[in-house]
């Protein structure tokens, strides 16, 4: 079974299942999702990484009086439309005997008080929404406000005219004798819509209250590792801080809902604590993750010279390139080797099943050969685990790279896809890793989701715009050839053999220096005649391959170009040794993202060919 033939069948089946409308809908849907996630990432990064919005809520807590600080996000009343600050918005927090209670107001930064009944109540009052007044966003905010006002004026104009038309229709119906006095609140009450709204809000609040994250912050890691008995014995106190999810530091209503249900509070709390305290350790009780906040996010402004900044950014770029090349090369090598063995195993298993031969030995040998790649994949995973310091993020990056490499192996056949798809993949991959390494406490998962959405749109774009039309033209051309020659079957092996022969002939011609306008070497004439004869009257692909091997044996190899050999000798030999004997053609295709090594006259697998005028004498043309 030929791998190319299998890939063509897979693409043909997918192109039949996914109609052009479905493909276009998926393409634009992923583009919309990617742009939306990118806008959310920009807003979140500007408000909570560059300028942490909730840092002012934690600066008043003096850790000199308490060694530990427990932070709780209360989400009561988040889905209700009441903007009033009530006592229900901030639930009571009961602390231990040796703990302190922090009470936050607009005028006071923090106060500590100890009651006689060993219970403490904390009240959190919301601050005005002036905490988001940032001079850098004034222009953007003004433009957005002007756009919203213009839209509001147009919508109000349409609504006014619609209301006038409805009032006129109502008067006409009243004159006729059919009253249309509709009481909307009464109608909603009759239809039980008010109860539906009430139950919906109550259900959302009950689901939201389940997600109330609690954090424990300390300046020294040893305080966190002590058991409760040791904490009480050594008089280690805990300050309880409660912040409402409706607090203005979390933005407007839509930002609050988005943070509570999608983004999460981890990154916001980490950046706020780092901006206020500068260092320490943070523990999340829900996810049981322990964060080290001692790593500086950027150099201080006083010591951040241009040289240090340049060295830092160059290090980030080199690290991103290292991760890119290591991950893609290992995944590509593993994928190509495993798919070759899987196809070979499938053919052998079909042969054994048809002839009723024992299959235990075949399956056992295939399993043993496949176990060789298990340590490779485990090594890749452990390398990414240590590199990202986050197992889930590393696994998601590996899955994303695996998906793109699988698309490259199966579908990328046209010249424009071969030229531009690896470059866009490199661009998206580098942008994500530059953001990840530049901001240690950034929104990494949101950035990865944005990158994944853009890469999925990239895959659908190239497959829908270039690969599927080329596949359809290839299938039509093959069907027309089968109709003209019923006894002649075009397989992907024949196409690949002729493609490699044409490519080798073109490279031999370019490496030779002609002595005249009509100068041809005997070897070239021999190759041309053999290919013409095979293309004109080929009846068996095996016979064609035998003739091709004989011609190659009689052909004098072309003189190598010393410049190209010197440019690729050392580096390519090292890469070939690392990859275990990979072919130079695969290396050239891998390096094609930086330089275009394919000319327009070289052949491709998918061809846009028309039926030849004289099929008995003209060679089989493969573009």
From Swiss-Prot:
Keywords in alphabetical order, please.
Answer: Membrane, Transmembrane, Transmembrane helix
**In which residue ranges is the amino acid composition biased (Polar residues)?**
514-531
Any one annotated GO CC term = membrane
Give the residue spans that cross the bilayer: 24-44, 315-335, 363-383, 392-412, 424-444
InterPro entries for this protein: Membralin (IPR019144)
Q: Where is this region: Disordered?
A: 99-119, 506-567, 602-623
Q: Does the keyword Transmembrane helix apply?
A: yes
Q: Name one GO biological process term.
A: regulation of sterol biosynthetic process
Q: How does it sit in the membrane?
A: Multi-pass membrane protein
> Where does it localize?
Membrane
UniProt similarity note: Belongs to the membralin family.
Q: Which PANTHER family match?
A: MEMBRALIN, MEMBRALIN/KINETOCHORE PROTEIN NUF2
Name of the protein in question? Membralin-like protein At1g60995
